[in-house]
């Protein structure tokens, strides 16, 4: 992770140092080294490379920030529960009470005195028995 953060900065620093070396007032090069280096970048190429490096750095930084925001959004949903569940027994009790409440409010269970079909079946069974 640290490599991704430092590599664009390192490349940017190298490019700046190369450009600064070419702009020195008293160059270290001798007269024999006056021949142009085929691997040296022209000014236009250097600027394009610098712009591309800065663009890649900004894009990567934005991607990392978006990933961190998504992680914090996902954890913020459970943050209130995490604050409430500082004690394990409180957390377990809250979870069980929530599940118990959901169980009692679920109307799809087909048994008990509250079930409409059962009352009719019991009443018709009593009438048949007489």
Curated annotation (Swiss-Prot):
Region Disordered, residue ranges: 62-84
Modified residues (Proline amide): 116
Expression tissues: Synthesized by C-cells of the thyroid gland.
Molecular function terms, GO-annotated: hormone activity
An example Gene Ontology CC term for this record: extracellular region
Record's keyword terms, sorted: Amidation, Cleavage on pair of basic residues, Disulfide bond, Hormone, Phosphoprotein, Secreted, Signal
Cystine connections: 85-91
A UniProt-annotated Pfam family: Calc_CGRP_IAPP
InterPro entries given in the database record: Calcitonin, Calcitonin-like, Calcitonin/adrenomedullin, Calcitonin_CS, Calcitonin_peptide-like
Signal peptide residues on this chain, from the entry's feature table: 1-25
Modified residues (Phosphoserine): 42
Protein localization: Secreted
Propeptide intervals in chain numbering: 26-82, 121-130
Any coiled-coil regions, as ranges: none
PANTHER family: CALCITONIN (PTHR10505:SF16), CALCITONIN-RELATED (PTHR10505)
Family of this protein: Belongs to the calcitonin family.
Function of the protein: Calcitonin is a peptide hormone that causes a rapid but short-lived drop in the level of calcium and phosphate in blood by promoting the incorporation of those ions in the bones. Calcitonin function is mediated by the calcitonin receptor/CALCR and the CALCR-RAMP2 (AMYR2) receptor complex.
Name of the protein: Calcitonin
Organism: Canis lupus familiaris (Dog)
């Amino acid at each position: 992770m640290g490599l991704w953060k430092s590599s664009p900065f390192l490349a940017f620093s190298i490019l700046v140092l190369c450009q600064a070396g070419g702009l020195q007032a008293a160059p270290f090069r001798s007269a024999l080294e006056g021949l142009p280096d085929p691997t040296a970048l022209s000014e236009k190429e250097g600027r394009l490379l610098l712009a591309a490096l800065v663009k890649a750095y900004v894009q990567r930084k934005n991607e990392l920030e978006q990933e961190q925001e998504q992680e914090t959004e996902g954890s913020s949903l459970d943050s209130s529960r995490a604050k409430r569940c500082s004690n394990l027994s409180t957390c377990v009790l809250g979870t069980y009470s929530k599940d118990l409440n959901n169980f009692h409010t679920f109307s799809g269970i087909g048994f008990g005195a509250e079930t409409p079909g059962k009352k009719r079946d019991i009443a018709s069974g009593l009438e048949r028995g007489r």
